[in-house]
Amino acid sequence: MRAQITISKQNLLYNYSQIKKLSSKEVIAVVKSNAYGLGILEIASILFASGVTFFAVATLEEAIYLRKNNIGGTILLLERTNEYALAYSYQITISIVSLSQIEDIKKSPVPVVAHLKIDTGMNRLGLSKDDINVIKNYSLTNLKIKGVYSHIACESSFMEQEKVFHEICSMIPNTNNIVIHLCSSSYLHKSPSYTTHVRVGIALYGISYIKSLILKEVLSLQVPIVRRKSVKINEKVGYDLEGIIKEEGYLYTVPLGYADGWSKDRLTIAYKDTYLMQVGKTCMDYMMFFSKNKYEEGEYIEIISPSLPCQKMASIYSSTPYELLAALSYRIKRKIIT
């Protein structure tokens, strides 16, 4: 008996429809980092079967995994790669994030299909205005530029970064025939008219940072009670015996630990309109919780649920939904419900 993730197909597709309605753009579904912990194949399969034909991933391995599992359409690789033949064989669109890549592409024995990543101020990855001027003077018959994009660092820098992006886009020939994407989940409502797509990850999964965008939670994380023990005051619990029972009741062991990506000590979990309190340190495979209420072994407790949503938990534990979700391990079983 182990932890399991339940994915709501209905809520995922609802969120997708709301995103399209708000942005009025085509959607690039970002399924990197195992679809933010929800399950890359589970999420991509639902979306592809529902007509989504553009995906973005972080690694070449993720892209190939999708192709091997019959996910069609365009797959954009966000990281830098020099494995051009491998990308070409799986019809992966790469990102050009540095001018030095152009020299590599000159030597490529196969055509390279790419999007240009523009650095508009975040200073992480991307080409500068000067880089674009250099690229314009290259004659590369094996390079096919199919898109251009950038990434916004924060709300306060949006206008400045958008201005830089627009200026650089105007320098690139034939932009009428390529994909242009700037806005991610937090900026869907600000997508400029000259862009063709929005690049959406966390919003697909029910996390909204836009007041007018009401979304539904896609993921529930449940764990079974594998052991119940009656405990008395001052009994000690867990590694280093740091946990101390403060009143008589029941100690419940659940199979979720830092090997599952649940590394922090989560102080509360919701169950049957009440909360259970964690006692002791989080172990590799287990956590222990206390309650005065008596529950049965084999019952499932929800760790993330509509009553304790991801955004609320992230706020309580001084974390972010990105961190909580993306850390969820591959070893947690994923199940799709309609």
Predicted regions: what is each one?
Residues 3-14, 25-179:
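Active-site-proximal beta-alpha core segment in soluble small-molecule metabolic enzymes
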